[in-house]
UniProtKB/Swiss-Prot annotation:
Name of the gene this protein is made from: Clip1
Pfam families: CAP_GLY (PF01302), CLIP1_ZNF (PF16641)
Protein name: CAP-Gly domain-containing linker protein 1
Entry's localization field: Cytoplasm; Cytoplasm, Cytoskeleton; Cytoplasmic vesicle membrane; Cell projection, Ruffle
Post-translational changes noted in the entry: Phosphorylated. Phosphorylation induces conformational changes by increasing the affinity of the N-terminus for C-terminus, resulting in inhibition of its function thus decreasing its binding to microtubules and DCTN1. Exhibits a folded, autoinhibited conformation when phosphorylated and an open conformation when dephosphorylated with increased binding affinity to microtubules and DCTN1. Phosphorylation regulates its recruitment to tyrosinated microtubules and the recruitment of vesicular cargo to microtubules in neurons.
Effect of residue 320 to E: Phosphomimetic mutant, exhibits a closed autoinhibited conformation with a low affinity for microtubules and DCTN1
Length: 1320
C-alpha cells in the first residue's frame, strides 16, 4: 500500500522497471485461450466503474476491495494525524495488512494484528477488479502492447484449435492450463511494465500541457485550488504552477523571494512543479480497452496462430475451393449481357430464336460449371474426412507428449513464479524507496522556497533596520541642533540679564545723582530764584516720568523675554524627551529584529541540516536496496538460463519427432488422394446422365421465361432512363452545392479580411489614444507653463507697484542707489539666463509639436488609406453578396424545379409499380386457377383409375390380361404428364414470386433514394438559410465598420482641433514672453531714473529679496523642467538605440531559430531511429535464446539507447524552450515594428515609451543610500543653517503705528501697559 506522506503531497509517478524476459511455452489446449480473451475484455469496464466510485460516499461496515484484490470491511472514515486529507481504515479478511488499527501511537479502530490497513477512499472499489489491475497496474490503463507482451500472448495463444468433429480428451490438462494462464499473464505484465510506463509518462505530459490558468486542480492529491500562474520562476528552474488554495494550507500570498507571480490572501498561495499538479475531472490515462485491443491484435497476428491449421495440404485444398468460387460467373453479369443483346434484336421472330439459342448455351455452361463445383466439393469433403481421422490419431500421440511436457512445465512455472514474486516484491520496495526519495526532494524544494521567502523577509528587515538607523541619525542630528539652539538661547539670556543688571545700576546711580542735585538745590536755593527752582523741578519731574516709563518698558521686555525663554525651554525639553523615547523604541525594535533574524537563521540552518541528514540516509538505503536487487537479479538469471537451456533441448527433440510423423502422414495422404480422384470420375459420369435428363425439363421452362423476361427488360430500361435523368439532376444539384460551398469559403475569406481590418482599426485607435495621452501630457505641461507665466506676471505687477512707491519715496543716497543698481544688474543677468532657458524649452516644445504633427499626419494618412481600403473591400463584398444572392435565387429555382420533376417521376414510378403488381397478381390468380383445375383433373383421373381398376377386375373374367395392361400403361402416362405440368406451373409460380420480391426491393430502394434526395434538399435549404444569415451578419458588420470609420474620422478632426488649440496656446505663450521682455526694459529705464532715498532702503531690500526668492523659485522650476525634458530626450534616444539593437538581434535570433528548428528535426529523427532500434532490441530480447552473455549485451545496448533517447528528449525540450523564447522575442520585435509602421525609428515600442514616461521615478537619496524617503536635493543631512539671520517680514500696513514701550525698549505694547511689578 502506497500511503501519502505527512506533508500531504501526492506520491510520485511510476518509475521505469527493468523488463524481464518472457518464456516461450509449447502449444497448449484451446481452453486457456478462450478464458484469456474475456479477462482482457473485462479489464475495460471496471476502470470506468472505479473512476465513478471514487466520488461515491463509502460507509462504515461496507465490504470493499483495496486496490481491487484485498477484500475487507470499512472500520474508519475521516481525517488522521499521520497525514492530511480523508483516509479509510479497513479490516482485511487475511493478515496481509500493516497494523492493528493504530498508527504512531494513535488508535483509530480495533482489529487483529496485520489485518488493519489505511488507504485513500479513491483506492477502494465495491467489486473485484481484473488480474492485471490486482497486480498493481490499475493506473496504467492506456499502455500500448509492447513486444514483450506480444511474446507472452504468443505463449498463451500457441495451442492448436480442436475441431468440432473430433472427440476431446478428459478435461484434466485443460484445468491445469487454465490455472497456468494467469501466472503467465502476470509474467507478461511484469515484463511489459518497462515499456508501458513510457506511454504513461507521455499521457501525463499531455495532461500537463492541457493545464490552463483558472483550472481546478489538486496539489499532492489533497490540496484543492485554482491555477493562477503557469511558467518559469526565478527561485527555481523548470515549469512551476502557482495555485490559490481553497483553505489556508499554503506557504505564501503569490510572491516568492520578492517577485510576485499572482495575488491572493496570505497562506493561500502554493507553488508546485507541473507534474505534481493534477486537473480535477481530467483522467491522466486512457481507459484499459486500448490495452485489451492491442493484446487481441497481437494474439491475432502471432505466428503461433498459423500453427493451428492441421497441415499444409488442407490449406492448399481450401485455396482451391476459394479459387473455384471466385471463378464462378455472376448471374447479374449474364443478365446484363443478355439484356444488351435483346435490346439490340427485339424486332422480329428471328431475334427471339437467336436469343433462345444463346440462352441455351448459357444454361449449358452453367450446368457444366455446377457439375465441376459439385465434384470439387465432394473431393474436398472426402479429403477433409480422411485428414480429420489422421489428425485425431496424431492428436492422441500429441496429447500424451503434451501431458508429459506440462508436468515439467508446471514445475518450471512454479519456480519462475516464485522468482517473479520475489522480483515484484523487490521492485515494489524499489518504487517505494524512489517515491520516498522524490517526496524528500519535493520537501527540500519546498524548504528552499520557504528559505527564499525567509531570505527576502530578512532582506526587507535589514532594509527596515537601515532605514530606522538613518532615521535615528536624522533624529540625533535634530536633537544636537536643538541642544545647540538651547545653549545659544541660554547664553543670550545670561547676556541680557547682565545688561539688565548694568541698567539697574545706572538707574540707581542716576537716582542718587538726582537726590544729591535736589539737596544741592534746596541748600543753594536763594529766595529770589523761585522761578529757576520751579523750572528745575518741572524738568526733574519730566525726567522722573521718563525714567518711570523706561523702567516700566524695561520690566515688560524682561517679563516677555522670560516667558518666551520659558516656553522655548519647555518646547525643547519636550522635543528632547520625545527624541529619547523614539531612540529607545528604535533601539528596542532593532534588538528584537536582530533576535528574530538570529532565530530564523538558526532555524534555517537546523532545517537544512535535518534535510541533509534525511537525504543522506535515504540515498544510502536506496543504494543498499539497489545493490541487493542487483545481486538477487544476477542469481535469478543464472538459474533461469540453465533451466531454459534444458527446456530448449527437450523442445527441439519433440519438434524433430513431430516432423517425422508429419512426413509419414503426408505420404499416406498422397496415396489416398489418387484413390479419391478415381471415385470422383465415376461420380461425374453418373451426374452427367442426371443433368441430361433435367435439361429436357428446363427447355420448356426457358420458353415461358423468355417472354416474361422481354417484358421485364423493357420496363427495366424505362426505369433506368428515369434513374439516369434523376442522377443528372442530382449531379446538377451537387454542382450547385459545391458552388455554394465555394461561395461560403469566399465569404469566410472576406470575414477573415474584415477581422484583419478590425485589428488594423484597433491598432490605429490605440495609436490615436496614445497620441491623445501625449496631447494631454503636453496640455498639462502648457498649463504648468501658464501658471508659471501668471506667477511671473504677478511678480512683475508687484515690482511695478514697488517701483512706483520707490519713485514716490525716493531719497538722496547715491551709494544705496549704486548698490541697488548692482543688485538689479545681477537680477537682469539671472533673468537673461532664464530667458535663454525658456527659449530652449520653447524650441523643445516646438520640436515636440512638430513630432506630434508628423505623427498625427501619419495617423491621418494611415487612417485614410485604411478607410479607402475598407470602402473598396466593402464594395467588393457588396458585389460578391449581390452575385451570391443571384446564385442563391437561381439555385433556389433549380431546387424547386428539381423537386417538381422528382415528385412527377416518383408518382409515375409508383403508378407503373402498381400496374406491374396488379399484372403479377392477375398472373398469380391465373396460375392458381390453373393449379386448381389441374388438381381437379388429377382427382378425376384418380377416380377414373379406380373405376378402371374395378372394371379391370370385372373384365378379368371376360377380357384378357394384355388389354388391361395396355389401359394401365396409358393411364400412368397421362398421370406423369399431369404431374410434370403441375411441377412446371409450380416453378413458374416460384419464379414469378421471386421477380415480385426483386421488384419490391427495387421499389424500396427507389423510395429510400427519394427520401435521401429529400433530406439532401432540406439540408441544402438549411445551408441556403445559413448563407442568408451570414450575409446579413456581414452586412451588419460592414455597417458597424463604416460607423467605426466615421467615429474615427470625427475623433481625428477633434484631435486636429485640439492640435490647433495647443498651437494657439504656444503662440500666446510666446507673446507673454515678449511682453515680459518689454516690461524688463521698462524696469531698466525706471531704475535709471530712480532718485536716492535713505528711509525706504530696508523695505526696498526686502522687496528685492522677495523678488530674488520668487525668481529663484521660478528658475529652479524651469531648470527642473529642463532637466526633466533632457532626461526624457535622453531616454527616447536610448530607447531608439536599444530598439535598433533589438531589431538587429531579432534578425540574428530569427536565423538562430531556423538553425534550432533544423537541429530539432534532426534530433527528432535520431530519437525515432533510436526508438526503432530499442523496439528491435526488445523484440530480439523476447525471441532470443537464454544465453546470458547475449542478454547482458542487449540489456546494456537497450539501456544505452534509452539513455540516448532521454538525453535527446531533454535536448529537444531545451531547444523547444529556447525556440519559444526566441519566437516570443521575434514577435515582440515585429509587433514593435508594426506599431511604428516601420518608418520612424523613434516610433518603435511606443507603448514602452509611454509606460516609461508615465511611471514616476522612485525617490532615492545618494547620501543616505535609501529609497522612497526623500531625494538627494531634499536630504536633511546636507541642509545647512544660514549664517546671516533672516530678514524680518511683518507684512503689516505701513500707515499703521506699531506699539512701542519706552520702558522695556521693545515693540509689542505701549508704556502704559507695561508691568511695573517685576523685580530685578
Amino acid at each position: 500500500m502506497s500511503m501519502l506522506k505527512p506533508s500531504g503531497l501526492k506520491a510520485p509517478t511510476k518509475i521505469l522497471k527493468p523488463g524481464s524476459t518472457a518464456l516461450k511455452t509449447p502449444a497448449a489446449a484451446a481452453a486457456p485461450l478462450e478464458k484469456t480473451v474475456p479477462s482482457e475484455k473485462a479489464s475495460g469496464p471496471p476502470s470506468s466503474e472505479t473512476q465513478e466510485e471514487f466520488v461515491d460516499d463509502f460507509r462504515v461496515g461496507e465490504r470493499v476491495w483495496v486496490n481491487g484484490n484485498k477484500p475487507g470491511f470499512i472500520q474508519f472514515l475521516g481525517e488522521t494525524q499521520f497525514a492530511p486529507g480523508q483516509w479509510a481504515g479497513i479490516v482485511l479478511d487475511e493478515p496481509i495488512g500493516k497494523n492493528d488499527g493504530s498508527v504512531a501511537g494513535v488508535r483509530y479502530f480495533q482489529c487483529e494484528p496485520l489485518k488493519g490497513i489505511f488507504t485513500r477512499p479513491s483506492k477502494l472499489t465495491r467489486k473485484v477488479q481484473a488480474e492485471d489491475e490486482a497486480n498493481g497496474l490499475q493506473t496504467a490503463h492506456a499502455r500500448a502492447a509492447s513486444p514483450l507482451s506480444t511474446a507472452a500472448a504468443t505463449m498463451v495463444s500457441s495451442s492448436p484449435a480442436t475441431p468440432s468433429n473430433i472427440p476431446q480428451k478428459p478435461s484434466q490438462p485443460v484445468a491445469k492450463e487454465t490455472s497456468a494462464t494467469p501466472q503467465i499473464s502476470n509474467l507478461t505484465k511484469t515484463a511489459s511494465e518497462s515499456i508501458s510506463n513510457l506511454s504513461e509518462a507521455g499521457s501525463v505530459k499531455k495532461g500537463e500541457r492541457e493545464l490552463k490558468i483558472g483550472d481546478r486542480v489538486l496539489v499532492g492529491g489533497t490540496k484543492a485550488g485554482v491555477v493562477r500562474f503557469l511558467g518559469e520562476t526565478d527561485f527555481a528552474k523548470g515549469e512551476w504552477c502557482g495555485v490559490e488554495l481553497d483553505e489556508p494550507l499554503g506557504k505564501n500570498d503569490g510572491a516568492v523571494a520578492g517577485t510576485r507571480y499572482f495575488q491572493c490572501q496570505p497562506k493561500y498561495g502554493l507553488f508546485a512543479p507541473v507534474h505534481k499538479v493534477t486537473k480535477i475531472g481530467f483522467p491522466s490515462t486512457t481507459p484499459a480497452k486500448a490495452k485489451a485491443a492491442a493484446v487481441r491484435r497481437v494474439m491475432a497476428t502471432t505466428p503461433a496462430s498459423l500453427k493451428r491449421s492441421p497441415s499444409a495440404s488442407s490449406l492448399s485444398s481450401m485455396s482451391s475451393v476459394a479459387s473455384s468460387v471466385s471463378s464462378k460467373p455472376s448471374r447479374t453479369g449474364l443478365l446484363t449481357e443478355t439484356s444488351s443483346r435483346y435490346a439490340r434484336k427485339i424486332s422480329g421472330t428471328t431475334a427471339l430464336q437467336e436469343a433462345l439459342k444463346e440462352k441455351q448455351q448459357h444454361i449449358e455452361q452453367l450446368l457444366a460449371e455446377r457439375d465441376l463445383e459439385r465434384a470439387e466439393v465432394a473431393k474436398a469433403t472426402s479429403h477433409v474426412g480422411e485428414i480429420e481421422q489422421e489428425l485425431a490419431l496424431a492428436r492422441d500421440g500429441h496429447d500424451q507428449h503434451v501431458l508429459e511436457l506440462e508436468a515439467k512445465m508446471d514445475q518450471l512455472r512454479t519456480m519462475v513464479e516464485a522468482a517473479d514474486r520475489e522480483k515484484v516484491e523487490l521492485l515494489n520496495q524499489l518504487e517505494e524507496e524512489k517515491r520516498k526519495v522524490e517526496d524528500l526532494q519535493f520537501r527540500v524544494e519546498e524548504e528552499s522556497i520557504t528559505k527564499g521567502d525567509l531570505e527576502t523577509q530578512t532582506k526587507l528587515e535589514h532594509a527596515r533596520i537601515k532605514e530606522l538607523e538613518q532615521s535615528l541619525l536624522f533624529e540625533k542630528t535634530k536633537a544636537d541642533k536643538l541642544q545647540r539652539e538651547l545653549e545659544d538661547t541660554r547664553v543670550a539670556t545670561v547676556s541680557e540679564k547682565s545688561r539688565i543688571m548694568e541698567l539697574e545700576k545706572d538707574l540707581a546711580l542716576r537716582v542718587q545723582e538726582v537726590a544729591e542735585l535736589r539737596r544741592r538745590l534746596e541748600s543753594s536755593k536763594p529766595p529770589g530764584d523761585v522761578d529757576m527752582s520751579l523750572s528745575l523741578l518741572q524738568e526733574i519731574s519730566a525726567l522722573q516720568e521718563k525714567l518711570e516709563v523706561t523702567h516700566t518698558d524695561h520690566q515688560n521686555e524682561v517679563t516677555s523675554l522670560k516667558d518666551h525663554f520659558g516656553t522655548r525651554e519647555e518646547m525643547f525639553q519636550k522635543e528632547i524627551k520625545a527624541l529619547h523615547a523614539a531612540t529607545e523604541k528604535l533601539s528596542k525594535e532593532n534588538e528584537s529584529l536582530r533576535s528574530k533574524l538570529d532565530h530564523a537563521n538558526k532555524e534555517n540552518s537546523d532545517v537544512i541540516a535535518l534535510w541533509k541528514s534525511k537525504l543522506e540516509t535515504a540515498i544510502a538505503s536506496h543504494q543498499q536496496a539497489m545493490e541487493e536487487l542487483k545481486v538477487s537479479f544476477s542469481k535469478g538469471i543464472g538459474t533461469d538460463s540453465a533451466e531454459f537451456a534444458e527446456l530448449k533441448t527437450q523442445i527441439e527433440r519433440l519438434r524433430l519427432d513431430y516432423q517425422h510423423e508429419i512426413e509419414s502422414l503426408q505420404s499416406k495422404q498422397d496415396s489416398e488422394r489418387s484413390a479419391h480422384a478415381k471415385e470422383m470420375e465415376s461420380m461425374k459420369a453418373k451426374l452427367m446422365k442426371i443433368i441430361k435428363e433435367k435439361e429436357d425439363s428446363l427447355e420448356a421452362v426457358k420458353a415461358r421465361l423468355d417472354t416474361a423476361e422481354d417484358q421485364h427488360l423493357v420496363e427495366m430500361e424505362e426505369m433506368l432512363s428515369k434513374l439516369q435523368e434523376a442522377e443528372i439532376k442530382k449531379e446538377k444539384f451537387a454542382s450547385a452545392s459545391e458552388e455554394a460551398v465555394s461561395t461560403q469559403t469566399s465569404m469566410q475569406d472576406t470575414v477573415n479580411k474584415l477581422h484583419q481590418k478590425e485589428e488594423q482599426f484597433n491598432m490605429l485607435s490605440s495609436e490615436l489614444e496614445k497620441l491623445r495621452e501625449n496631447l494631454t501630457d503636453m496640455e498639462a505641461k502648457f498649463k504648468e507653463k501658464d501658471e508659471r507665466e501668471d506667477q511671473l506676471v504677478k511678480a512683475k505687477e508687484k515690482l511695478e507697484n514697488d517701483i512706483a512707491e520707490i519713485m514716490k519715496m525716493s531719497g538722496d543716497n547715491s551709494s544705496q542707489l549704486t548698490k541697488m543698481n548692482d543688485e538689479l544688474r545681477l537680477k537682469e543677468r539671472s533673468v537673461e539666463e532664464l530667458q535663454l532657458k525658456l527659449t530652449k524649452a520653447n524650441e523643445n516644445a516646438s520640436l515636440l509639436q512638430k513630432s506630434i504633427g508628423e505623427v498625427t499626419l501619419k495617423a491621418e494618412q494611415s487612417q485614410q488609406e485604411a478607410a479607402k481600403k475598407h470602402e473598396e473591400e466593402k464594395k467588393e463584398l457588396e458585389n460578391k453578396l449581390l452575385e451570391l444572392e443571384k446564385k442563391m435565387e437561381t439555385s433556389h429555382y433549380q431546387c424547386q424545379d428539381l423537386k417538381a420533376k422528382y415528385e412527377k417521376a416518383s408518382s409515375e414510378t409508383k403508378i407503373k409499380h402498381e400496374e406491374i403488381l396488379q399484372n403479377f397478381q392477375k398472373m398469380l390468380v391465373d396460375t392458381e386457377d390453373k393449379l386448381k383445375a389441374a388438381q381437379e383433373a388429377n382427382r378425376d383421373l384418380m377416380q377414373d383409375m379406380e373405376e378402371l381398376k374395378s372394371q379391370a377386375d370385372k373384365a378379368k373374367a371376360a377380357q384378357t390380361a394384355e388389354d388391361a395392361m395396355q389401359i394401365m400403361e396409358q393411364m400412368t402416362k397421362e398421370k406423369t404428364e399431369t404431374l410434370a405440368s403441375l411441377e412446371d406451373t409450380k416453378q413458374t409460380n416460384a419464379k414469378l414470386q421471386s421477380e415480385l420480391d426483386t421488384l419490391k426491393e427495387n421499389n424500396l430502394k427507389t423510395v429510400e433514394e427519394l427520401n435521401k434526395s429529400k433530406e439532401l434538399l432540406n439540408e441544402e435549404n438549411q445551408k441556403m438559410e445559413e448563407f442568408k444569415k451570414e450575409i446579413e451578419t456581414l452586412k451588419q458588420a460592414a455597417a458597424q465598420k463604416s460607423q467605426q470609420l466615421s467615429a474615427l474620422q470625427e475623433e481625428n478632426v477633434k484631435l486636429a482641433e485640439e492640435l490647433g488649440r495647443t498651437r494657439d496656446e504656444v503662440t500666446s505663450h510666446q507673446k507673454l514672453e515678449e511682453e515680459r521682455s518689454v516690461l524688463n526694459n521698462q524696469l531698466l529705464e525706471m531704475k535709471k531714473s530712480l532718485p536716492s532715498n535713505t528711509l525706504r532702503e530696508s523695505e526696498y531690500r526686502k522687496d528685492a529679496d522677495e523678488e530674488k526668492a520668487s525668481l529663484q523659485k521660478s528658475i529652479s522650476l524651469t531648470s527642473a523642467l529642463l532637466t526633466e525634458k533632457d532626461a526624457e530626450l535622453e531616454k527616447l534616444r536610448n530607447e531608439v538605440t536599444v530598439l535598433r539593437g533589438e531589431n538587429a538581434s531579432a534578425k540574428s535570433l530569427h536565423s538562430v531559430v531556423q538553425t534550432l528548428e533544423s537541429d530539432k528535426v534532426k534530433l527528432e529523427l535520431k530519437v525515432k531511429n533510436l526508438e526503432l532500434q530499442l523496439k528491435e532490441n526488445k523484440r530480439q530480447l523476447s525471441s532470443s535464446s537464454g544465453n546470458t552473455d547475449v542478454q547482458t549485451e542487449e540489456d546494456e545496448r537497450a539501456q544505452e539507447s534509452q539513455q540516448m533517447i532521454d538525453f535527446l528528449n531533454s535536448v529537444i525540450v531545451d531547444l523547444q524552450r529556447k525556440n519559444q523564447d526566441l519566437k516570443m522575442k521575434v514577435e515582440m520585435m515585429s509587433e514593435a515594428a508594426l506599431n511604428g509602421n516601420g518608418e520612424d525609428p523613434n516610433s518603435y515600442d511606443s507603448d514602452d515609451q509611454e509606460k516609461q514616461s508615465k511611471k514616476k521615478p522612485r525617490l532615492f537619496c545618494d547620501i543616505c543610500d535609501c529609497f522612497d524617503l526623500h531625494d538627494t536635493e531634499d536630504c536633511p543631512t546636507q541642509a545647512q543653517m544660514s549664517e546671516d539671520p533672516p530678514h524680518s517680514t511683518h507684512h503689516g500696513s505701513r500707515s499703521e503705528e506699531r506699539p512701542y514701550c519706552e520702558i522695556c525698549e521693545m515693540f509689542g505694547h505701549w508704556a502704559t501697559n507695561c508691568n511695573d511689578d517685576e523685580t530685578f
